[in-house]
């Protein structure tokens, strides 16, 4: 009989429920965990014991126990935490459970101890349950016991450790920045925290450590990282959280290639430790190439359905919508070919207009090329034979294809077709195997905010313009490019970064272009501008969305599945009831009252 191997001298168990194998047969073990299932077969009782590492089957036989063990087994119920002692033995060939890593063995239990009891759980603690997400979030501490959720947390822990080690091994210094800072809105609203000691003044929870990490570069840290909590009080979309985690990185005395190459090393190392190969150097795709080809600045390049420019074909078309766009400066006529969707029923195709409207379209023009060679479309009657022939050739049309069009401003047309491309890939269940990594670079420096009637920073107001575009910023801001790079993984923006402005005068000019008065710029960012005057070095950085990357690595549908205690889409914590009211006394302490 082998010796019991303690996994931790400060633990009640000697083995976990996920590690015992055939080679452990004959070993005495002590296990702890929760009763997952219990089956009474008359003279024998079987119990599946679960801990964070897995499940082991226990066998209770009155002839091989201390007398109380079998009696305890008769009373045990799901989710009771217990401690047992026993001997590992092999299961018979006919009783081996191939679904479990421990399926070749069981533990013949000679002693059992109930550590606590449990009320009946609101759902079964196992994978594949059909319980609503709200119920799972209400009882999140139970949901976390499920193997799938525990595996997600384990992967997140392992990946965080891997990227920390990869950074540490490359001389990056982990530095913590404050969670109570000055309110400097970066696009979303700040979560503000009233000061009790200074009535009427407020801290803000940081949307990112952006300004602080730039100050660390001024301070000489040179290579910084932090696994940082970030907070944004924005209108929540389906898969956004008011607080999230990013791996925040900054470097100084570097150019853009230095930063990107260092990041590739770090990311390739960290992903490699997770068993995911990330070939380096990564592809670099220009922003406009991504938009014009895929309709997205975060393209999934694992499948085709590329956007195709048809502007020249319809310059003289009798279909006025296309002809107008083809002859208007800055507008285009483009299309995608969804192969296989041409066989869809007319009613199903008509519903795609509603999908397109969510991406900004006022309607959706389409042509269905049926398998029998016929054509179904409300617009084809306006096309000449020459236009149809050119369309067929350029779109590589085959029977069964569905061609969908967008006509109008270039960027809007790209975004509409990019959204439809993604929708159709899901609807047609196009396979996307493996992981897809690339950089998207050279984003515009600004975009026009139609609501505010003002320029807005495409990334953030501290981004360095490309050297060749500095001179044109004031004359034509929308034509200026930026020293930016987004890390794209499987069609998601997994991270983003850029080079920073390290000159105080240029930073002030940038803020003025964004509508800041000099007084407002000094009020919000004066401390940064002052720091830049003290020999600020060239600097650039990056932030990796830890939640998003872990979602992709686990194959989860939502970032909520890789967070221990997430909020709902409305920002609520269903478990604790947050956000909640506070007492009048608490409000009085910080000189506030409810209106």
Which role does the model predict for each range below?
Residues 1-595:
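Class II aminoacyl-tRNA synthetase catalytic cores and aaRS-like
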């Amino acid at each position: 009989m082998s010796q019991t191997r303690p996994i931790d001298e400060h633990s009640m168990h000697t083995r976990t429920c996920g590690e015992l194998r055939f080679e452990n047969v004959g070993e005495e073990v002590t296990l702890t965990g929760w009763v997952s299932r219990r089956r009474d077969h008359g003279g024998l009782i079987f119990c599946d014991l679960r801990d964070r590492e897995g499940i082991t089957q226990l066998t209770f036989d009155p002839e091989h126990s201390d007398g109380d063990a079998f009696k305890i087994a008769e009373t045990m119920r799901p989710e009771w935490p217990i401690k047992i002692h026993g001997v590992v033995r092999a299961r018979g060939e006919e009783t081996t459970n191939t679904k479990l890593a421990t399926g070749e063995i069981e533990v013949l239990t000679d002693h059992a101890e109930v550590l606590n009891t449990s009320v009946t759980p609101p759902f079964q603690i196992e994978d594949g349950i059909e319980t609503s997400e709200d119920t799972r979030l209400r009882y999140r501490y139970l949901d976390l016991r499920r193997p799938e959720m525990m595996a997600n947390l384990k992967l997140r822990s392992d990946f965080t450790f891997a990227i920390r080690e990869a950074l540490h091994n490359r001389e990056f210094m982990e530095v913590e920045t404050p969670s109570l800072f000055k309110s400097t809105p970066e696009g979303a609203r700040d979560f503000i925290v009233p000061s009790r000691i200074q009535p009427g003044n407020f801290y803000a929870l940081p949307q990112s450590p952006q300004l602080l990490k730039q100050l660390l570069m001024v301070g000489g840290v040179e290579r910084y990282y932090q696994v940082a909590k970030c907070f944004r009080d924005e209108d929540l979309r389906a898969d956004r959280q008011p607080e999230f985690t990013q791996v925040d990185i900054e470097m100084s005395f570097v150019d853009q290639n230095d930063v990107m190459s260092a990041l590739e090393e770090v990311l390739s190392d960290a992903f490699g430790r997770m068993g995911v190969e990330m070939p380096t150097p990564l592809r670099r795709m220009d922003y406009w190439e991504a938009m014009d080809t895929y309709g997205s600045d975060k393209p999934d390049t694992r499948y085709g359905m590329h956007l195709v420019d048809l502007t020249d074909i319809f310059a003289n078309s009798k279909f006025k919508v296309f002809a107008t766009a083809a002859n208007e400066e800055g507008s285009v006529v483009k299309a995608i070919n969804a192969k296989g969707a041409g066989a869809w029923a007319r009613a199903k195709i008509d519903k795609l207009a509603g999908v397109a409207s969510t991406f900004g379209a006022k309607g959706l023009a389409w042509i269905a090329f049926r398998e029998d060679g016929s054509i179904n479309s409300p617009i084809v009657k306006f096309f000449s034979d020459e236009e149809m022939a050119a369309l067929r050739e350029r779109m590589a049309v085959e029977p069964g294809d569905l061609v969908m069009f967008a006509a109008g401003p270039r960027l809007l047309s790209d975004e509409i077709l990019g959204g439809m491309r993604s929708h159709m890939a899901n609807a047609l269940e196009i396979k996307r195997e493996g992981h897809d990594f690339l950089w998207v670079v050279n984003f515009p420096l600004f975009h026009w905010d139609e609501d505010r009637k003002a320029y807005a920073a495409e990334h953030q107001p501290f981004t360095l313009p490309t050297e060749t575009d500095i001179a044109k910023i004031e004359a034509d801001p929308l034509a200026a490019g930026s020293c930016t790079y987004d890390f794209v993984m499987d069609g998601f923006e997994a991270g983003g970064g850029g080079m920073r402005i390290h000159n105080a005068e240029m930073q002030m000019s940038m803020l003025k272009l964004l509508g800041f008065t000099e007084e407002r710029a000094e009020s919000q960012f004066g401390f940064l501008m002052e720091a830049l005057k003290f020999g600020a070095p060239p600097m650039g950085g990056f932030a990796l969305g830890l939640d998003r990357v872990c979602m992709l690595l686990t194959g989860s549908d939502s970032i909520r599945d890789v967070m221990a205690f997430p909020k709902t889409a409305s920002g609520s914590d269903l478990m604790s009831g947050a956000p909640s009211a506070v007492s009048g006394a608490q409000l009085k302490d910080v000189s506030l009252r409810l209106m």
